[in-house]
Regions:
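Glycine-enriched alpha-helix->loop->beta-strand junction motifs that scaffold or abut catalytic
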Residues: 153-157, 240-247, 262-268, 293-296
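Hydrophobic faces of well-ordered beta-strands that scaffold small-molecule active sites
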Residues: 52-56, 94-96, 130-134, 157-163, ...
Length: 382
């Protein structure tokens, strides 16, 4: 169903952050003031009507494209499966974290080119709004020409400035072969070949700062949202801010998040961190950060269902009421990405809406993405 319909009698989260019993009308992909003459009316009494989820960083799509090292599936099949995962988890807008790295294989430049070339043609067949966050590994200078072209696309991708190379070199020096071996398996090469690529990338360290400035200037010219990544100190956050990185993604220390929040910037942390009770890498707790006002956005990271489950867990544990908690997965992510046409339920906004039954364990009943209605009616734990 993608034309005109109404949700009636539900508890609707208003832009003011309160719930009101109201009807919500959808036509031609937008929220409108009045119902259409012939559109169906869907009874939502006893249910909660919320703006759909906006995911600013998710890389679970990689496993659909590359389910095993060296195994690639057709992009149309893989992204169709990703689309269904998004919709069945209440996500109407997804920024796919596309790593652009010196690594061979799934995260290499050529794989990035293939994805970016294919996505525009796939979009019309997909229900959710599929966008891209370019996860540029800052030692990958061969990709800068490609990035310049991608920044001209519509919609403009976001860009995150990642440095896992320095970490990899540190692991190499310390003899931590386990992590490097895992990365080599992901790239589909031997450990020796991976180390050779890593060391070759490391030889460009003297040029990295200048290249970061170059790419940041390009991104600014195209009004692309820029994100920092894995910052460890407040001084790093300030330096990132100076060149235009206004979103702080996955800070590794409280002082970084506090610096960002004090400057009015959004801080992104992983929803899996919430549902697991902590970070899988030993970084700061997302639940504690939310409780302390140091996290404003949750992202799926590597697991799409975590966004709904994290919101449910935070409400159940008394971290915040539903209205306030929901801003972490809808209004704030939309704002952080500069998407002022979604993240709230009001006329003229894009019709991205979910309907939840919260009478017991949360049950997602309907997802609307760009006016397209999907009826689900399943429990989140199923």
């Amino acid at each position: 169903m993608s034309e005109s319909f109404s949700f009636t009698g539900g508890a609707v989260l208003t832009p003011d952050g309160v719930f009101e019993t109201a009807d919500v009308h959808i036509a031609d992909g937008r929220i409108v003031d009045a119902p259409s003459r012939d559109g169906p009316r869907i009874d939502c009494r006893g249910r909660v009507v919320l703006p759909a989820i906006v995911d600013v960083h998710g890389d679970a799509f990689e496993l659909e494209i590359h389910p095993r090292p060296g195994v690639d599936l057709p992009l149309d099949i893989a992204m169709g499966a990703v689309d269904r995962q998004l919709v069945t988890n209440g996500i109407a807008t997804a920024f796919h974290g596309l790593t652009i790295s010196w690594e061979p294989g799934a995260r290499g430049i050529e794989a990035g080119r293939t994805f970016m070339d294919a996505l525009p043609a796939l979009r019309p067949s997909l229900t959710a709004d599929h966008r891209v966050q370019l996860r540029w590994e800052t030692f990958t200078h061969d990709a800068i020409h490609d990035i310049a072209g991608w920044l001209r696309l519509d919609p403009t991708p976001a860009i995150a400035f990642n440095d896992h190379t320095t970490l990899g070199l540190a692991d190499l020096r310390s003899g931590n072969a386990r992590k490097l071996d895992r990365w080599a398996q992901r790239a589909g090469v031997s450990l020796d070949d991976y180390v050779a690529c890593l060391e070759a990338a490391g030889e460009q360290s003297g040029d990295v700062a200048g290249r970061i400035g170059e790419v940041a200037a390009m991104a600014a010219r195209h009004d692309a949202v820029m994100l920092s990544h894995d910052e460890q100190t407040a001084s790093e956050r300030r330096a990132s801010r100076e060149i235009g990185m206004r979103v702080c993604e996955f800070p590794l220390a409280r002082e970084v998040a506090a610096e960002a929040v004090a400057a009015g910037e959004h801080v992104v942390m992983g929803a899996p961190n919430v549902i697991r009770g902590g970070s899988h890498t030993g970084a700061m707790s997302a639940e504690d950060a939310v409780r302390d006002g140091l996290c404003t956005v949750l992202a799926s990271d590597y697991h799409y269902p975590s966004l709904l489950h994290a919101a449910e867990r935070l409400v159940a544990r008394g971290v915040g009421p539903l209205a306030a908690t929901w801003t972490l997965v809808s209004a704030n992510p939309a704002a952080s990405m500069g998407l002022d046409d979604r993240g709230a339920i009001e006329p003229c906004r894009r019709a991205d809406i979910i309907v939840l039954d919260c009478s017991g364990p949360w049950r997602l009943v309907h997802t609307v993405a760009g006016g397209v209605l999907t009826t689900l009616g399943r429990r989140l734990s199923s």
